[in-house]
Amino acid sequence: MKRYYLLIILSSLIALLSCEKINYMYYLEKDSNMTFDLNYDVEPYIKALFPYTDKDGHQYISFQNGFKNQIVFYDIQTKEMAFKIDLDIEGDNGVGFFLGYYIDSLDSIYLTSLQLPEIYSVNKDGKINKKIYYGKSKDGNVLNACNSLSFSYHPILKFNNNLFVLSECNRWKYPNPVSAMIDLNTGNVQELPFEYPRFSGADNKKKNAGVELYFSRCFNGDKFIYSFFYEEDIFITSIDHNIVKRVNVKSNYIDRVVMPNDYNGTLKSMCENPNYGNLLYDKYRNVYYRVCYLKTEIDNRENYMELWDFGRKIFSIIILDKNFNIIGETVFPEYTYNPNLMYIDEKGLYISENHYKNPNYDDDKLIFRLFRLCKSKEKYNDSAV
């Protein structure tokens, strides 16, 4: 009998101690917004948007002006356009048509060609520093053009005087690498040993690139992290891509992803069915944010292409710690935010409110809402309002 009571007492003590150990989870809490008044000739349809801080610590939001050969810079403090860079299409400093870019400095901005495996390095005056061709690796393998975008978040990156670029998927050839590395000293192009994953049920090569076309990539200073939109797992690679680790990062709100049907798939189904989206690294808090598009229904009268461009109807964001453990997930209200337009600074995560079905939408303004990373005692029950 004494042993019985002793067990009860021990169990009670363990329970009390367990209550003291609070398993803090995290969520994204809505904060203030920031509004940029767009100049009359600046378009709100943005595929490439990146923050930039100059050598004096001055902060800007930069983005390509629609599909024009122009990058605009807005001052984050004044909320006004600070300057713009116009790029010639033809002539001595002609770069052709470009889509996407990466800013190393204002003296070294890398532009990715719209359709060709070419990159131009230019300065803030639009003068060409260098033209880089990456259509064939040093081993003779063909690489495909891929743009440096934020819409599908996979900007190119300069690290240790190497430029890490992407190669669009081509299921017809082998090898089929996701990325390549360009030595900026020698110009050598080396394909990296990480290939596009194969997805069951997506083996029809007649469909252009298949679902592998949609993916996101970020860099934490030590590793590259890939998020394919129709794959639960993320892929973590070493800088040289010789080591690849696969980690499951499943949304609490997605049972399974639904791939577009090769023959009968429509934009409507791509707006309704669940899948994953962009992955961003927050260097200030050492966490990651993975967008998840949740299953929903769309009115048949909706413009599906426009809805796709503006971030669909409803999404959540998974929060991962530095070891890629899920520590929270926040669901966002329908038709309010555009997760295709996000950026991060020392205050938190900014998500654009430029969704055409948002009642406050104005195509003469670019609006971002700040979300701060906060602790919560509740697991997976958080939603942004």
Report each predicted region and the residues it spans.
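Blade-loop segments of beta-propeller domains
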Residues: 80-110, 114, 135-147, 332-338
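Loop/turn-rich, solvent-exposed surfaces of beta-rich toroidal or solenoidal domains
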Residues: 271-319
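Beta-strand-rich domains and repeat architectures in extracellular enzymes and scaffolds
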Residues: 38-71, 289-293
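Short, conserved, GDST-rich strand-edge loop motifs in beta-rich repeat architectures
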Residues: 166-174, 290-311, 354-368
